[in-house]
Amino acid sequence: MAPKRRRTTESEINQVTQNCSSRITRAGISSKKINNNSSPVVVFAHGAGAPSSSEWMIRWRNLLADALKAIEVVTFDYPYISKRKPPPKAEKLVEFHSDFVKKIASKYPKHPLILVGKSMGSRVSCMVAVENDIKASAVICLGYPLKGTKGAIRDEPLLQLSVPTMFVQGNKDGLCPLGSLEGVRKKMKALNTVYVVENGDHSFKIGKKNLEMAGITQEEAERLAVQAIATFVSQISK
């Protein structure tokens, strides 16, 4: 019998929402509201090893906000971050994540909801998107951790999805071998696609030699990935 999950309190969600809003305003991301109902609201979840205030998360929040013309890109921290504890199993983060998504979605009921996650955050985002009371338009997985610590393929949340899903993966990401991902994608019932960052690792970092050989910068490589995300979101919105 599965252990009973502790119910997330309203005060916990409100506190995280307030913290996120203050960070976003200081970063200049969501201070400008776009009066266009086609502009999505994006809830962006961090990975296991770094909070929403990490350089990578801030950079990608900016990229997503610009490329998707989002009315708001909201990041947050899972509770274990403030407690300085190691991350729990992804399943134990679903309730908090889901409650937070509902809180943000209620602010923008007429705008498409896009769930984005980095690594562990993408896995939890997929679990949240499966819930009946979450009406997401798409899920974007940035470095999906398909391979578990003991090598098991963790595809259960993906096979349950019915929401259009995009994977952005580095082909040197040991946590998500592209061959394994391709096999899972064929079994998924949801519309899905993948964008491969050539020579990118789990965080899409490309080695200096490979960048020189390709005649591209790291920034340009990441912008190409974000442009692909914007194209995907635009296509499913038609």
Question: Residue ranges of each PLM-predicted region?
Answer:
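Short beta-strand/loop motif that positions the catalytic acidic residue
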Residues: Q160-S162, F167-Q169, D173
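Alpha/beta-hydrolase-fold catalytic nucleophile elbow
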Residues: D77, L142-G143, V197-E198
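Conserved alpha/beta-hydrolase "acid-adjacent" motif
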Residues: G174-S180
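The conserved beta1-alpha1 loop
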Residues: V43-G47, G143, Q169
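C-terminal catalytic histidine-bearing segment of alpha/beta-hydrolase fold enzymes
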Residues: N192-K238
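Serine-hydrolase catalytic machinery in alpha/beta-hydrolase-like enzymes
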Residues: V16, C20-I114, R123, F204-A214, ...
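Acidic beta-to-alpha connecting loop that harbors the catalytic carboxylate
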Residues: A48, N171-D173, N199-D201
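Primarily recognizes the serine-hydrolase "nucleophile elbow" in alpha/beta-hydrolase
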Residues: H97-V163
